């Protein structure tokens, strides 16, 4: 049994290469079955995200070159082009790498939690494809346990390190229960999409997406059960909004002090939490002067992100130690597992010899044999049969000068120099 982890990621390959090596969800089952069939891999799983494509494999004999060639052929790349960006981890290093990936230690955003869910999806697809067996299955379970321990025992996932997540985290500090809050998101780009996802996951009661074009606002809104409006509708929506987060490419402010003052009057001065992520700013700076407005800018969030990233980097050291222990423990249990088949066969052989001698003894007793004599004969016969094969092999090893094997046998049978009878001088 041998483990292999092979792939590319955001640190080793450009976006162009990562896009060309990525697997679509529809490709995965067929790709896994083909991978096992063409590379002599007994078990396999594929993790494919925007930042990485990795193959996790169990083989009788490691063959990284064959797997790399298959990956190049599958995606119609030259082997040299792929080899320039690929990395290979074997055995213990492969186990440790999987645990680091699942724990977010190898992610673009240190400690990000989404990767664990993606790893679990990779395992589920491999099970569907029938390419996960007992060994890779055990490795995945150990990997999930290690990642859970990292999350539980360290602070690596506690502090937000993206602007979008930081904005939502600040909102949670202002509003004890986001499930009772309404949010107005201005813009429909990547950052606002992330904000919408985080707010949706937090159970915000109602989300409104305002954008220059209704089409783009609607596309985003449909993903999270939100409502889409135009920028011109913002004044009407503002009065119902507890949270306002804006990120557009506008060169002029979209939200002014007068519109916010009017909304606050309608809200009877119920506070509004605002985050302006845009550069240039979408919200006039004077809005921050209003008593019932909590206005944060992108610079405020960057300070939070920088401090939190520093905190995560400190937690990463403890996480790395947990992963190292987890990998060592898994390899130890795997080595112990290798002896199970031998022990099972030896036990079956011993039980067969025992049954043979027992049947012989029962026949002697049935024929009137003396019980003490029968028991003595049973003991001698069983001892001789159990020792026969080891005795023959030990004599053979001794004749061949295999002193190392003899020493191992002495350890195996828990013998020492004083345990054997010596011939009289």
Curated annotation (Swiss-Prot):
Annotated NADP(+) binding sites: 187-192
Reactions catalysed according to its record: (S)-4-amino-5-oxopentanoate + tRNA(Glu) + NADP(+) = L-glutamyl-tRNA(Glu) + NADPH + H(+)
Residue numbers binding substrate: 49-52, 107, 112-114, 118
UniProt site positions, description: Important for activity: 97
Active site: 50
Highest taxon, organism lineage: Bacteria
Family matches, as PANTHER family: GLUTAMYL-TRNA REDUCTASE
Family, per entry: Belongs to the glutamyl-tRNA reductase family.
Protein known as: Glutamyl-tRNA reductase
Lineage summary: Bacteria, Pseudomonadati, Pseudomonadota, Gammaproteobacteria, Pseudomonadales
Gene: hemA
């Amino acid at each position: 049994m041998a483990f292999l982890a092979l792939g590319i990621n955001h640190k080793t390959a450009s976006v162009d290469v990562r896009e060309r090596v990525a697997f679509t969800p529809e490709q995965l089952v067929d790709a896994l079955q083909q991978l096992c069939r063409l590379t002599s891999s007994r078990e396999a799983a594929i993790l494919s995200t925007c930042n990485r494509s990795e193959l996790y494999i169990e083989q009788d004999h490691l063959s990284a070159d064959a797997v790399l060639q298959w990956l190049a052929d599958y995606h119609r790349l030259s082997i040299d082009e792929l080899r320039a960006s690929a990395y290979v981890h074997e055995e213990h290093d492969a186990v440790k790498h999987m645990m680091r990936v699942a724990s977010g230690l190898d992610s673009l955003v240190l400690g990000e939690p989404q990767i664990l869910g993606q790893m679990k999806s990779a395992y589920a697809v491999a099970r569907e494809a029938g390419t996960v067996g007992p060994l890779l299955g055990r490795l995945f379970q150990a990997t999930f346990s290690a990642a859970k321990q990292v999350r539980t025992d360290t602070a690596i996932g506690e502090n937000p390190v993206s602007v979008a997540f930081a904005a939502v985290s600040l909102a949670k500090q202002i509003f004890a229960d986001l499930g009772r809050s309404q949010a107005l998101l201005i813009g429909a780009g990547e950052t606002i999409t992330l904000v919408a996802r985080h707010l949706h996951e937090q159970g915000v009661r109602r989300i409104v997406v305002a954008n220059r074009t209704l089409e783009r606002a609607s596309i985003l809104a449909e993903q999270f059960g939100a409502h889409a409006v135009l920028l011109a509708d913002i004044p009407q929506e503002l009065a119902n909004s507890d949270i306002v987060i804006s990120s557009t490419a506008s060169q002029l402010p979209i939200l002014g002090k007068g519109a916010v003052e009017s909304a606050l009057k309608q809200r009877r001065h119920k506070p509004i939490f605002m985050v302006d992520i845009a550069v240039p700013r979408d919200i006039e700076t004077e809005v921050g002067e209003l008593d019932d407005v909590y206005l944060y800018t992108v610079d405020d969030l960057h300070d939070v992100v920088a401090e939190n990233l520093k905190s995560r980097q400190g937690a990463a050291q403890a996480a790395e130690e947990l992963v190292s222990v987890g990998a060592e423990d898994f390899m130890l249990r795997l080595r112990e597992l290798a002896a199970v088949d031998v022990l099972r066969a030896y036990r079956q052989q011993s039980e067969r010899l025992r049954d043979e001698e027992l049947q012989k003894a029962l026949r002697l007793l049935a024929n009137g044999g003396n019980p003490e004599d029968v028991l003595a004969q049973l003991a001698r016969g069983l001892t001789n049969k159990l020792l026969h094969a080891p005795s023959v092999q030990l004599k053979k090893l001794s004749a061949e000068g295999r002193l190392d094997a003899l020493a191992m046998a002495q350890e195996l049978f828990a013998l020492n120099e004083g345990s054997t009878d010596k011939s009289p001088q």
